[in-house]
């Protein structure tokens, strides 16, 4: 069976068992900043397992895209060199949220793996592990399924602590946890390795293909295991691993999907399609890079973008090792789309965007190599001894993406070595930081957990009555909040919009007889709306009735901006093209901010076109229509869904101007487009590679912005003694006059420097056959001093020159050494000493160097170093 057929068979099998097929979530975990990337099928259901979210189904099945590169789960350095390590993989999974448990989960797994209608694997090839004390699972396997005892293995606590076992899973130090049972496939005696639990278990003979986790306990901070009221099931089976089994190969790189990617990689690079690890690196990395970009990650120097940049550059480096010339990586995207585009339509939709990002990053990496070389040269100029420190090697690798092996090559050419141990210490420190940031980082038992959902009344108005169903103080449920206390109020129904979809939460107040709670913000936890604020008067108790009143002016101003965001999105696709995808937004009462995919700055005429289109829709004053429907019907109608956003079974479709703008949106909006009044773009710029940002204002804020601009024009006209009508002519004449004066000033400086050079040459002293000149010239910039040093070198012949001066409170230094002396004396070494004396740094070539500092009082001491430098060096 091909990989695509296995994926579909798995999902269809569990659909027949009453599971809801759920689309893969984004690689960027929703509402979970503690997790770097989605790395397991259960990530998108985490709140369901924690009891914080309830869905319309209790059984689910998915094929989840996962990335393991950076953080706790980091396979990057092994990729390409082993048979089964990948940065990207698919995890097939079936899940039960308080529905079925061990018996059904085990029988389902066995039926799918061995059933004639399904995978039809030979039963005698399958081994099973269970947690040492999980007699229930052991008995189901042996007495009901019929797995013989000789192929059953009990795994105890093999990681040095109670419940620390390959067969015991935990979400964190506290919270849901439980035993797991794993299914292994035996590749046969011709492959080295032993069964699970044996000393040879790390061999390739017995390969884990399926893991069933039984969440049946809640571990509290004291280590006590409490049975969960509704035990759940979380399973995972790696698609690539089971594909290798069914296709009778021993390496994931030999399965159909990778064979096609390896072929495309070899063609793009122009090398042989052989078993080279570097080729496997490229074929693997195109998957993780493409999917990360499709999900909104872009190369950067921090966080997720930094990991993406590392993966891209690793692929480029390995491509270069295979002989690639120029950019090649982006050319493989088409082959990936052909393989996986049907299962993951976001690849098809964003193919051009992915290719452009990869090509841009490849080109940037080529420039980065040049930059890294310059940085390395500066560090080598300051090097004392013959070993490049580990922190320098790490800085080049980590900050500039400079490959360690290249640093090593350069060091070897100069008879230097690198401090490999020091570099490894820096790398380990980075890994520790990543591991710390990748943990869930929360105590499950201190989370705000609310049963039920809050009914939202805000589409109908800004006020309503509700009953208090829960109160929280410092994350703990309480029965009462006293006057002056800060806390969270949960109502059975509310007109307050909870922050989501880029729109900020509502503010306002809750009121009852003698009681007032000022609401500063509103957020969501599962389906509940959390009103954050302070008790301004009286006290609140669970069960009490309150009147909820949203700040109407803030809500209305926010609605103007949110509706304008939808119009802007549609206008962008009209003006720039369908490649435009929303990458983020912020909507509050003051402004709107919209991030989107595009590869160049928007031209002035395009910005004007955007404003004209949006304002035309505003003037049309069409009704804003909403419709509640299911997600599939909404997409069939052309509604734009934001990839990675979590949508329920029922969605709200918002339409403006007929079919001008049709999007899925749960936010609050105007009734008619004319309510927006006016739309004005205030700024446009880049926020990351391939992502632009537009900020704008609407309504009264737009009028205020235009009035402010008008006042600035009047003030500018007054400053140049003109009017609004002739302001541009006046400014043009002023700038031309300024350029003329600057040119005259440069000419005067050059004459002064030349005259100074004539005078200075006479001040040079001779030391060991070389002329040495050190002089102070305040008021000259580095450019003028460089020209003067060049002039003096020609006048003096065999010479060492150090010039410095104070300019705008800072020290400027320039050093020069004539070519006949650079074998013994280096301008960079002299500059290093002189700049250090004035509290600064410097460097450059052996014949010319620049530097500076902040301590002008030490300038004369710095200049005096020139004579000693020559005396010691000759």
From Swiss-Prot:
Catalyzes the attachment of alanine to tRNA(Ala) in a two-step reaction: alanine is first activated by ATP to form Ala-AMP and then transferred to the acceptor end of tRNA(Ala). Also edits incorrectly charged Ser-tRNA(Ala) and Gly-tRNA(Ala) via its editing domain. NCBIfam families: alaS. It is found in: Cytoplasm. It comes from the Bacteria. It catalyses: tRNA(Ala) + L-alanine + ATP = L-alanyl-tRNA(Ala) + AMP + diphosphate. Consists of three domains; the N-terminal catalytic domain, the editing domain and the C-terminal C-Ala domain. The editing domain removes incorrectly charged amino acids, while the C-Ala domain, along with tRNA(Ala), serves as a bridge to cooperatively bring together the editing and aminoacylation centers thus stimulating deacylation of misacylated tRNAs. Binds 1 zinc ion per subunit. It comes from Pseudomonas aeruginosa (strain ATCC 15692 / DSM 22644 / CIP 104116 / JCM 14847 / LMG 12228 / 1C / PRS 101 / PAO1). Pfam families: DHHA1, tRNA-synt_2c, tRNA_SAD. This is Alanine--tRNA ligase. Keywords: Aminoacyl-tRNA synthetase, ATP-binding, Cytoplasm, Ligase, Metal-binding, Nucleotide-binding, Protein biosynthesis, RNA-binding, tRNA-binding, Zinc. The keyword Chloroplast does not apply. The keyword Ligase applies. One of its GO terms (molecular function) is tRNA binding. Its cofactor is Zn(2+). One of its GO terms (cellular component) is cytosol. Zn(2+) binds at residues 562, 566, 665, 669. GO terms for biological process: alanyl-tRNA aminoacylation; negative regulation of DNA-templated transcription.
